[in-house]
Regions:
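Transmembrane-helix signature of polytopic, membrane-embedded enzymes
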Residues: 2-10, 84-107, 126, 145
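Aromatic- and kink-enriched transmembrane "portal" helix at the membrane-lumen/periplasm boundary
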Residues: 17-19, 63-70, 102-125, 134, ...
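Membrane-interface alpha helices of multi-pass inner-membrane proteins
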Residues: 35-38, 101-103, 146-161, 171-174
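Loop-to-helix entry region of an early transmembrane alpha helix in multi-pass inner-membrane enzymes
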Residues: 48, 52, 60-82, 114, ...
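Transmembrane-helix motifs of polytopic, lipid-linked glycan transferases
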Residues: 71-92, 130-134
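Membrane-interface transmembrane helices that cradle and orient dolichyl/undecaprenyl
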Residues: 89-92, 131-149, 154-157, 175-181
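Perimembrane helix-loop-helix junctions
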Residues: 139, 166-198
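Hydrophobic, aromatic-rich transmembrane alpha-helices
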Residues: 277-300
Length: 300
């Protein structure tokens, strides 16, 4: 089963390495390169998983530190495509369609471009796809071990990128709903699932430690200087968990913006995003493949 995914991983990594950034970059990628090298706190929402895995990547291996951080993105982009092929094969999809799906995703603009430089997306996608696989396996088998493993990966997914929060919420609540209701054991299993989820989110505690000890690069220190250049930091922004809460919920605004739900605006955003995905991302590659797949399905 794993021969085809291994081949996809090797080919994808070779392709990404052809265009990978050779050294230090700018903007968010430069920030992530520094964090991978020395640790610290990134801009909201903190992205602790990237920082922790990045520290491992920059500790071992050759080449300059900035390149190793770029290599992290390329490696996990290739690993995500390999995992996608393995996942689809396990779901009964043939080898050719599974590889076509990996090709469509792996050559889409955002996925390809973020595989070339230090970014959080490929690592986050890898963990999220693993969480999806294990969640479906847990729902289908009802096994407690798989359910707890899925809960852990769902928590870890949030440490990768908060963009997956809607998926995590739906998957987590579905797992909780499907826990067998067997008296007191039911409550025990629910609490165990919650504990597994919280355990997956423990990388966020690294942000608390890095902030309180002044370890590495700290975006929160920059916020302190920008908001209160001469006056002391107010008590409401001084406690570790208040600062962590701001990182996760503020959308990089101080004071944090309140959340509002406007159905028309949500519909417009969905429409705009769908158009961009169809025009610039998966659409140009996936549409011909979808037509070919539909034709084959009709022919058989």
């Amino acid at each position: 089963m794993w021969l085809l995914p291994a081949a996809v991983f090797g080919l994808a990594l070779a392709g990404y390495l052809r265009g990978i950034a050779p050294g230090l970059l700018w903007g968010d990628s430069a920030e992530m390169q520094i964090l991978a090298a020395i640790g610290g706190v990134a801009h909201p929402t903190g992205y602790p998983l990237f920082t922790l895995v990045g520290r491992l990547f920059t500790t071992f291996g050759g080449g300059e530190l900035a390149f190793r951080a770029n290599l992290l993105s390329a490696t996990f982009a290739a690993a995500t495509l390999a995992l996608l092929v393995a996942f689809l094969r396990r779901r009964g999809v043939g080898g050719v369609p599974a590889c076509a799906a990996a090709l469509a995703w792996g050559t889409s603009f955002t996925f390809w471009s973020t595989a070339q430089r230090a970014e959080v997306y490929s690592l986050a996608a890898f963990v999220a796809l693993g969480a999806l696989w294990l969640t479906l396996a847990a729902l289908e088998s009802g096994e407690r071990a798989r359910r707890l493993g899925a809960g852990f990966l769902l928590g870890l997914t949030l440490a990768g990128h908060m963009a997956f929060a809607p998926f995590v919420a739906v998957a987590g609540l579905t797992l909780a709903w499907r826990v067998p209701r067997r008296g007191a054991a039911w409550l025990g299993d629910e609490f165990a699932l919650l504990a597994a989820f919280l355990l997956g989110g423990t990388p966020f505690l690294y942000l608390v430690w890095a902030d309180t000890t002044g370890h590495g690069l700290s975006y929160l220190k920059l916020v302190d200087l920008a908001q209160w250049p001469v006056s002391p930091v107010p008590a409401s922004f001084r406690t570790p968990f208040a600062r962590l809460a701001w990182l996760i919920t503020s959308r990089n605004e101080y004071p944090a913006m309140s959340f509002h739900f406007y159905p028309r605006l949500v519909a417009k955003n969905i429409s705009d995003t769908s158009f961009l995905l169809a025009l610039f991302e998966i659409g140009p590659v996936a549409f011909p493949l979808a037509v070919w797949g539909a034709w084959r399905r009709r022919a058989t």
